[in-house]
């Protein structure tokens, strides 16, 4: 079995952009409406992704499938980019 890393090591790594969990259904619906998409249109992030595991440990609760993860990337060339991914179970 793989050794678990300290969530702060994962979440504060220089190559890992800021991730924020959104699990409030009203907020999710508002975001989807603003983007003009359905949940199924968003890219996915699995519940076993190292960042999702670290966020779960940091928040003290399991991040459930159907939640959104807001990812904010800062780039010297592209500026600030915000993307959303929907949490899903990994394929079996």
Curated annotation (Swiss-Prot):
EC number(s) given by UniProt: 2.7.7.6
Keywords: Cytoplasm, DNA-directed RNA polymerase, Nucleotidyltransferase, Transcription, Transferase
Annotated GO CC locations: cytoplasm; DNA-directed RNA polymerase complex
Gene3D superfamilies in alphabetical order: RPB5-like RNA polymerase subunit
Keyword Nucleotidyltransferase tagged: yes
GO molecular function, one term: DNA-directed RNA polymerase activity
Entry-linked InterPro entries: Arch_Rpo5/euc_Rpb5 (IPR014381), RNA_pol_subH/Rpb5_C (IPR000783), RNA_pol_subH/Rpb5_CS (IPR020608), RPB5-like_sf (IPR035913)
Biological process (GO), any one: DNA-templated transcription
Signal peptide: none
KW Hydrolase (keyword) present: no
Catalytic activity line of the entry: RNA(n) + a ribonucleoside 5'-triphosphate = RNA(n+1) + diphosphate
Pfam family, one: RNA_pol_Rpb5_C
Quaternary structure (record): Part of the RNA polymerase complex.
NCBIfam families, alphabetized: PRK09570.1
Protein name in the entry: DNA-directed RNA polymerase subunit Rpo5
Lineage, highest ranks first: Archaea, Methanobacteriati, Methanobacteriota, Methanomada group, Methanopyri
Gene transcribed to yield this protein: rpo5
């Amino acid at each position: 079995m793989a050794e678990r890393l300290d969530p702060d090591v994962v979440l504060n790594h220089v190559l890992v952009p800021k991730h924020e969990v959104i699990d409030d259904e009203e907020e999710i619906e508002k975001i989807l409406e603003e983007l003009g998409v359905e949940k199924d249109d968003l890219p996915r992030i699995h519940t076993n992704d190292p960042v999702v595991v670290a966020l779960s440990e940091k928040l003290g609760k399991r991040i459930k499938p159907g939640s959104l993860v807001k990812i904010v990337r800062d780039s010297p060339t592209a500026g600030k980019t915000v993307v959303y991914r929907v949490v899903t179970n990994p394929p079996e």
